[in-house]
Amino acid sequence: MMHVRYILQTCLFLVISTMAVAQPVSGELIGADSVQKVMIIPFNQYNYFSDADNELAEKNEMSATDISTMFRYGLNYNISTRVIATDGAYNILTDTTVSSAKDLELIYASVTYQFEKPVDVTVPDTLTDRTIKQPDLFGMGEQEPVKEEKKKLIDVKKEDEEPKNEKYLNAHVTHPEIFPVLQQKYHTDIFLFINSFELVTNYNHCLDRSKNYFERKVVVHYSIYDANGKQLKGDAMTVTFSSQQTNVDEIIATQFPVIAEYLAGTVTHVAQTDAPDTSTKK
């Protein structure tokens, strides 16, 4: 497997080099004097995790593959719609050209994934010591022991206070030279990676015992980069709902806009923070 991956990485480097020769590459932000354009990169199907697909497939009379495809396109559509409202957006998933399909595969081939602590360019302390030792897609793995004084604070936490993510699945781009190439080709300044999609049922939290309804959540892991390959943000966004909601179209229509609205706002915030100061100094 390592030998095969080495060959793929070598081929990828050659392809990117060829693309770079075919057109000028600067890495300078195109959107410095205008609205920035965001490339939305959907999650790879290999990074789709769900413990509810069998149930949803039966309720919706479709295959599990159809369920994951609908969630993938539904999430991408919602995100692009919200991003367009504040920034420009390029949706590579719905671009039907042969070139864009190949470029999406190149992007996937240039990315590796690792669990890390959330990172935010607006919070400098998050840019160091980000590695997490326990990779666990469903958040059920072991965690580091909590010190006694911290444990007391956790016990008295308000019920309506959302817990912060301790880890998320980050996208590491092994060939950052692909960013300015894609920027020149698609005129995009910001790259929003949807790294993984999780649909998880919490069977320890029963919402209605008479009807056997449990808490269910969608977790979307994401990373945001600029055209220079600088990571601006990385975290996971979670929405929680009842397992009573089993209609796929309804889940997409009610839950995904919440995720999309958050991501669109996050992109705008970090992009503005990262934008160069073009004001004239006197």
Task: Enumerate the predicted regions with their spans.
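Detector for methionine-enriched segments
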Residues: 1-2, 19, 39, 62, ...
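C-terminal/domain-edge helix-coil "capping" segments
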Residues: 23-51, 68, 155-206, 210-282
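Short secondary-structure boundary/capping segments
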Residues: 2, 54-58, 209
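Bacterial Sec-dependent N-terminal signal peptides
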Residues: 1-30
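N-terminal segment of the mature soluble domain
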Residues: 54-193
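An exposure/low-complexity boundary signal
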Residues: 17, 108-113, 280-282
